[in-house]
Amino acid sequence: MNILNKIYSLLILIVIVLAVIAFIDRSKKIDYSTLLFTSEPLRVREIYLKSGNSDDYGNFNYPNPEYFAWKQSEPSSDNRFLNFPDSLSVTYFSYTDSLFYHSNVSIRDFNPEAWKEYKKAGEYNTFSLGIANKGWIMLWCTNDSKGTTLLLKTQLKPVEPGPQDLYYIKQYNKQDYITEMFDNISDSIRLNIKNHYYNTDYQDSTDYSLKP
């Protein structure tokens, strides 16, 4: 009987510990919205915010390759009851240079003090992601008490696409996929690309204010 009592006591202790951990984890959850704008026409395959090893994914509304402008975005995507993100996953095809980009980027390493302050505040945040030409990406965070701060700025390196990157309705090889992508945009966008209309350098365009 003593052994059974010890087993029951141990099980109860385990349940209590797990309940406390679950409560602490739930208390860290926040709501946030996301915005995405680009300076060039893109075919986005996947973009999301992530927190550690959790199953929390902060989603974005993907841009339209026909309608876009730097620092202009709508609508937003609402994400509910998630951990504060510490990384960003980006996968897209750039029409202007016909290159593929993919990377999982740490958010907290670029501006760790600001990242910690926004996370600690536990407020409703808006994450605004800008994707410029030549692989430049920038991520700002905005809330009521701290305003807007640049949390991430980095230049992604182009990568060779995998089979999953070359799938659009059906599987393509690399060249046929690129051809198909250009067949799906308007003549005006193709002409602008040919005339290097989207080659403006935005890597130093870090000032950003989220309009109410």
Predicted segments with their positions:
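Positively charged n-region of N-terminal signal peptides that target proteins for export
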Residues: 1-6
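Contiguous beta-strand segments within globular domains
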Residues: 25-36
